Amino acid sequence: MRRRETFRLAAGGSVAGLLSPRIARAEAEVERARRGLPSPKIQDVQVINTAPRGLRLCVVKILTDQDGLYGYGCATFTQRADLVGPAVERYLKPFLVGKPADRIDDTWQALYNSSYWRNGPVLNNAISGVDLALWDIKGRQAGMPVYQLLGGKLREAADCYSHASGNEIAETLDNARALMERGFRHVRIQV
């Protein structure tokens, strides 16, 4: 092999290495088009306020233009749950309707960076609900749980914790012990 041929092959390999992610994305788009699955567009954004066991939760539901394709995301900020819903409905919804549901990172960046003050806890929780709902849509489209889309299972189970509080330190400690007797290995204490 001559020097020029070696250089040409090496250069070709480098270019192919740079282009391969783009080619893979393009091939995926072609495959999607062949299957007749256009990119879903966000048609509506709804807020569901709920309070299991008295804990106020705000859930975001995103509906797409594809029949039966929707996603749920939790936008919980229990201290200001009554503000998260209006943030989704009045601020985020007008921006989201009509946008592609499969451009998750693009959407997150636009929502996060669109506010002069970089949002704060209420709007950040609203954005997290939208983000989770969009991932739920992608998982439903793929026919698999979101954790598989993100690389698969890391462990079989995850430890949960509970919260112990009380009016006095002794009461708080008693509540923590009771939780540990119920099987919790981790207890958050607030004095």
Residues covered by each model-derived region:
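Glycine-rich, aromatic-flanked loop segments that form ligand/cofactor-binding clefts
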Residues: 131-165, 171
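N-terminal export signals
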Residues: 3-26
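Metal- or metallocofactor-binding catalytic centers and their adjacent structured scaffolds
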Residues: 65, 69-141
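Residues that line or immediately flank small-molecule/substrate-binding pockets and catalytic motifs
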Residues: 49, 77, 191
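C-terminal segment of N-terminal export signals and the immediately downstream linker at the start
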Residues: 20-53
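Short beta-strand elements
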Residues: 58-66
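Short, basic and Ser/Thr-rich N-terminal targeting/leader segments
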Residues: 53-56, 128
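Metal-dependent enolase-superfamily TIM-barrel catalytic cores that perform enediolate-based chemistry
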Residues: 156-191
